[in-house]
């Protein structure tokens, strides 16, 4: 019992020290953080090889038509993006509203604003592409309705709390995936926008649907589509685009205005078609180090 308590205290101590260091890093100028990111790329890619096998396999399977030279070029570009992404995420702890607005621009938000004028709550989705964290943080600075972002909590409580504080600094509300239906019910009379990262991997025994995505049979979550059909809320996609280091633009694209008129899996298929087109156009900015295809369809009869 005492040894378990001691281990817990040591873990919390290391976590607290880590968070203190991250908060310190966050206060540094953005230009200096990008300098550190450029340095971090070399040990991460060439020495540590962080998830390099996963990234390489994902790229090879996703782009069978590309040569190994082309694959490696995308791979290196991804790791450069990933190191910037890590430090941009840390910057969320201190970034000002004005700087975030300057760095993340939303286009054609009139699509959202029209639904708001009509008194309609909205469902929105995006993928783990570019800097989705900055995108969600910047969303709370627009004229969009109250945003509820669905997320998976981190196992470490201290780091989960740190992330939560960063993500909600400007008014967004983050709710754990398991609480989605409860919060939907409790806010049904309010004007809201629920946001989903629709490219997460489902738990093996919960897989219900596979679709073709990046040349592979891919298990996907159906939560967004199920909620859309239950609530008949319009569904939009936030398409993020990298402009230059630290600068992004987000385009809004309608998936459907009336889910009741869609066919089975149409909403899910359309959201993944949009993401696939984005990745094919500029592949380096998706989260390739995630084990997206860890499940085999033979494991599941769905």
Task: Label each residue range with its predicted role.
Residues 56-57, 136, 164, 208, ...:
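Short glycine-/small-residue-rich flexible loop motifs, especially phosphate/cofactor-binding loops
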Residues 118-178, 203-209, 216:
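Catalytic core of membrane glycerolipid acyltransferases/transacylases, capturing the structured
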């Amino acid at each position: 019992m005492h040894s378990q308590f001691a281990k817990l205290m040591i873990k919390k101590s290391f976590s607290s020290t880590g968070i203190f260091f991250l908060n310190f890093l966050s206060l540094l100028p953005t230009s200096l953080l990008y300098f550190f990111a450029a340095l971090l790329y070399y040990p991460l890619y060439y020495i540590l090889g962080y998830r390099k096998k996963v990234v390489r396999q994902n790229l090879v399977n996703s782009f069978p038509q590309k040569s190994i030279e082309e694959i490696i070029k995308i791979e290196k570009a991804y790791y450069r993006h990933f190191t910037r992404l890590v430090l941009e995420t840390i910057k969320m702890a201190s970034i000002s509203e004005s700087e975030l607005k300057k760095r993340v621009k939303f286009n054609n938000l009139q699509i959202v604003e029209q639904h708001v004028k009509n008194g309609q709550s909205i469902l929105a989705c995006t993928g783990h592409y570019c800097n989705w964290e900055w995108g969600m943080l910047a969303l709370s600075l627009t004229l969009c309705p109250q945003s509820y972002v669905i997320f998976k909590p981190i196992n470490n409580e201290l780091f989960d709390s740190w992330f939560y504080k960063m993500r909600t600094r400007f008014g967004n509300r983050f709710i754990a995936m398991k609480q989605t239906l409860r919060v939907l019910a409790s806010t049904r009379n309010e004007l809201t926008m629920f946001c989903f990262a629709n490219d997460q991997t489902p738990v093996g025994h919960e897989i219900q649907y596979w679709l073709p995505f990046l040349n592979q049979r891919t298990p996907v979550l159906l939560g967004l589509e199920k909620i859309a059909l239950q609530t008949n809320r319009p569904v939009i996609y936030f398409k993020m685009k990298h402009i230059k280091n630290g600068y992004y633009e987000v385009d809004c694209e309608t998936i459907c205005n009336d889910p009741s008129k869609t066919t089975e899996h149409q909403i899910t298929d359309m959201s993944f078609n949009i993401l696939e087109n984005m990745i094919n156009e500029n592949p380096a900015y998706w989260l390739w180090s995630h084990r997206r295809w860890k499940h085999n369809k033979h494991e599941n009869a769905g």
